[in-house]
From Swiss-Prot:
Name this protein carries in UniProt: UPF0213 protein Spro_0507
SUPFAM superfamilies assigned to the protein according to its UniProt record, in alphabetical order: GIY-YIG endonuclease
Coiled-coil regions listed in the entry: none
Family: Belongs to the UPF0213 family.
PANTHER family: UPF0213 PROTEIN YHBQ
Domain GIY-YIG: start-end pairs: 6-81
InterPro entries listed in its UniProt record: GIY-YIG_endonuc, GIY-YIG_endonuc_sf, UPF0213_domain, UPF0213_GIY-YIG_endonuc
């Protein structure tokens, strides 16, 4: 029997200060609600209203973790470009991994 693995997503949240937070999850809506309720990352607690700025499918957990690492290495300008002009694919960040934005 084949086990169905969940699809992971990379997401970016914008804080009122303009800062972008990057994370991964299997359910973007659920994770955003957790963050807004103060039950997510400590870095976001008490930061005010969070807005989903970007999200994309990232494949399995391993690929999602690698993509998250690469996005966190981007400069603020590069992250803002990613948010304002979402590419059709994030393959350029992980040449060995196919990732669809959406």
């Amino acid at each position: 029997m084949t086990e169905i693995l969940p699809t992971w997503h990379l997401y970016m949240l914008r804080m009122p200060s303009g800062m972008l937070y990057t994370g991964i999850t299997t359910d973007v809506t659920r994770r955003l609600a957790q963050h807004q309720a103060g039950k997510g990352a400590k870095a976001l607690r008490g930061k005010g209203q969070l807005v989903l700025a970007f999200h994309c499918q990232a494949g399995d957990r391993s690929k999602a973790l690698r993509l998250e690492y690469r996005v966190k290495q981007l400069s603020k300008t590069q992250k803002e470009r990613l948010v304002s002009h979402p590419p059709l694919s994030l393959d350029y960040l992980l040449p060995d991994v196919a990732v669809k934005a959406g």
